[in-house]
Curated annotation (Swiss-Prot):
The SOCS box domain mediates the interaction with the Elongin BC complex, an adapter module in different E3 ubiquitin ligase complexes. This is Suppressor of cytokine signaling 4. Transmembrane segments: none annotated. SMART domains: SH2 (SM00252), SOCS (SM00253), SOCS_box (SM00969). Residues 376-425 form the SOCS box domain. Induction: Up-regulated by EGF. Residues 1-10 have a biased composition (Polar residues). SOCS family proteins form part of a classical negative feedback system that regulates cytokine signal transduction. Substrate-recognition component of a SCF-like ECS (Elongin BC-CUL2/5-SOCS-box protein) E3 ubiquitin-protein ligase complex which mediates the ubiquitination and subsequent proteasomal degradation of target proteins. Inhibits EGF signaling by mediating the degradation of the Tyr-phosphorylated EGF receptor/EGFR. Residues 1-29 are annotated as: Disordered. It comes from Homo sapiens. Residues 12-29 have a biased composition (Basic and acidic residues).
Length: 440
C-alpha cells in the first residue's frame, strides 16, 4: 500500500497553475481528468490505475479527432462567410486572409502614396479658358496664371515670337497684373522665379506680361523635381499648342495686308428674259410641272433605260430639270443657262447647247449622240393630268410679250408677278469699281 501511494503521489502534478502547460490546463477541463482522487480511492490496486490510464488515452484520441473536425468546420465557415472571395485562391492566400482577420496588416501602398505629392497636370483645354478653373491660392491656380501671363503668341508663318503693340490701358493692366503675380510668387516659399528674355532675328521680345519672357521655376524639393513635370515642359507644351491653334486676328497688321488679297467692289448688270418656248414646253407631254426628285423617282421606278420626264427644278437658280433612267437607276440633271443658251453643263464649251429647251431635249433622244456621262432622253413619260387654265393662259401671254412688256400691261401687280415667274437672268456687263491705286 505504501508503494502504491508513493507511485500515485509521483503521478500527481504539483506545479502551480501559471507554470503548467496549455495541454495540462485542457486536460483539467474534461470530465475524466478534472475529477480529484479521494483518499478512499488511493487504496485501489495498481491494475485499476492502469485501466484508468487506458481510458484516458482513448479520451485523448477522441479529443484530437474533435479538434480536427472543429478546425475543418471553422474553415468551412470562413469559406461560406467570405463568399466568392476564396474561389480560385490557393491555400497560402486563404491562410493570409485568415491571419489578416485576426491581425490586420497595414497597406504599404497607401502609406507611400499619401506621402508623395499630387501628379495633377494642367490640360491644354484648361489653358484656353478665360477664367482659372482651379480654386484660388492653390498650386494649380498659380501654375495656370503663370503660364497664361508669361507665354507670348506665336507667329505661324515664321515660327518665332512676335512683339505686339499694346495700348496705354493694356500696359497699365499688365503692370498691375505683374505686381499681383510677384506677390503670389512670394507666397510660395519652395520656388524661385528667374526671368529669361529670349530674342529672335526678326523681332525682340518686349518687357511685360504678354511678351516673350519665359519664367523658369527652380524647385528646392527633390520629390517635386522627380514626380511632377517642370514648368519649362509645361511652357513648351503651351507654346506649341498655341502655335497650332493660333487665330488669324492675332497676326500683325502688316502681315495681314501682305497675305490677304485686295478686295474689289464689282457691279454686275443683268437682263431679265422670259423662257422663249414656254408654250411649246407646256404642250409637251413629258412636262409634269412642279415636282421634286422623290416623286420623279417614284414615277420612274421599274421603267426601261432612256425613260425621262421634264419638271420644274427645286432650286431657285434653275428653271427646269430632267429625271431619267440610266444604268438601272433614276438620275437627275439640271438645265443650265449661259448667254441665252441652254445645256446640261454651261461651263463646258464642248457640251451641246441650244437656244431653247425643246431643242435640247430633241438632241439627247438619239443614243448614238449621247455620251456615257450625259442623260439619255429617248422615251418620254406621258403626263397623266392636264394643267390649270390659269397656267395655260400664262404660257400664251408670255409667248406674245417680253419681260419688260409685262409691266406695260393693264393688269394688277400680283398678276404681273405671276406672269414673270418663268424667266432667267443673263449677265450683260461686269464693272469693277473702287479699285485700289497701285503703289510704286
Amino acid at each position: 500500500m505504501a508503494e502504491n501511494n508513493e507511485n500515485i503521489s509521483k503521478n500527481v502534478d504539483v506545479r502551480p497553475k501559471t507554470s503548467r502547460s496549455r495541454s495540462a490546463d485542457r486536460k483539467d477541463g474534461y470530465v475524466w481528468s478534472g475529477k480529484k482522487l479521494s483518499w478512499s480511492k488511493k487504496s485501489e490496486s495498481y491494475s485499476d490505475a492502469e485501466t484508468v490510464n487506458g481510458i484516458e488515452k482513448t479520451e485523448v484520441s477522441l479529443r484530437n479527432q474533435e479538434r480536427k473536425h472543429s478546425c475543418s468546420s471553422i474553415e468551412l465557415d470562413l469559406d461560406h462567410s467570405c463568399g466568392h472571395r476564396f474561389l480560385g485562391r490557393s491555400l497560402k492566400q486563404k491562410l493570409q486572409d485568415a491571419v489578416g482577420q485576426c491581425f490586420p496588416i497595414k497597406n504599404c501602398s497607401s502609406r507611400h502614396s499619401s506621402g508623395l505629392p499630387s501628379k495633377r497636370k494642367i490640360h491644354i483645354s484648361e489653358l484656353m479658358l478665360d477664367k482659372c478653373p482651379f480654386p484660388p491660392r492653390s498650386d494649380l491656380a498659380f501654375r495656370w496664371h503663370f503660364i497664361k501671363r508669361h507665354t507670348a503668341p506665336i507667329n505661324s508663318k515664321s515660327d518665332e515670337w512676335v512683339s505686339t503693340d499694346l495700348s496705354q490701358t493694356e500696359l497699365r493692366d499688365g503692370q498691375l497684373k505683374r505686381r499681383n503675380m510677384e506677390e503670389n510668387i512670394n507666397c510660395f516659399s519652395h520656388t524661385n522665379v528667374q526671368p529669361c528674355v529670349i530674342t529672335t532675328d526678326n523681332a525682340l521680345c518686349r518687357e511685360g506680361p504678354m511678351t516673350g519672357s519665359v519664367m523658369n521655376l527652380v524647385s528646392n524639393n527633390s520629390i517635386e523635381d522627380s514626380d511632377m513635370d517642370s514648368d519649362d515642359e509645361i511652357l513648351t507644351l503651351c507654346t506649341s499648342s498655341r502655335k497650332r491653334n493660333k487665330p488669324k486676328w492675332d497676326l500683325d497688321d502688316e502681315i495681314l495686308q501682305l497675305e490677304t488679297p485686295p478686295k474689289y467692289h464689282t457691279q454686275i448688270d443683268y437682263v431679265h428674259c422670259l423662257v422663249p418656248d414656254l408654250l411649246q414646253i407646256n404642250n409637251n407631254p413629258c412636262y409634269w410641272g412642279v415636282m421634286d426628285k422623290y416623286a420623279a423617282e417614284a414615277l420612274l421606278e421599274g421603267k426601261p433605260e432612256g425613260t425621262f420626264l421634264l419638271r420644274d427644278s427645286a432650286q431657285e437658280d434653275y428653271l427646269f430639270s430632267v429625271s431619267f433612267r440610266r444604268y438601272s437607276r433614276s438620275l437627275h440633271a439640271r438645265i443650265e443657262q449661259w448667254n441665252h443658251n441652254f445645256s446640261f453643263d454651261a461651263h463646258d464649251p464642248c457640251v451641246f447647247h441650244s437656244p431653247d429647251i425643246t431643242g435640247l431635249l430633241e438632241h439627247y433622244k438619239d443614243p448614238s449622240a449621247c455620251m456615257f456621262f450625259e442623260p439619255l432622253l429617248s422615251t418620254p413619260l406621258i403626263r397623266t393630268f392636264p394643267f390649270s387654265l390659269q397656267h395655260i393662259c400664262r404660257t400664251v401671254i408670255c409667248n406674245c410679250t417680253t419681260y419688260d412688256g409685262i409691266d406695260a400691261l393693264p393688269i394688277p401687280s400680283s398678276m404681273k408677278l405671276y406672269l414673270k415667274e418663268y424667266h432667267y437672268k443673263s449677265k450683260v456687263r461686269v464693272l469693277r469699281i473702287d479699285a485700289p491705286e497701285q503703289q510704286c
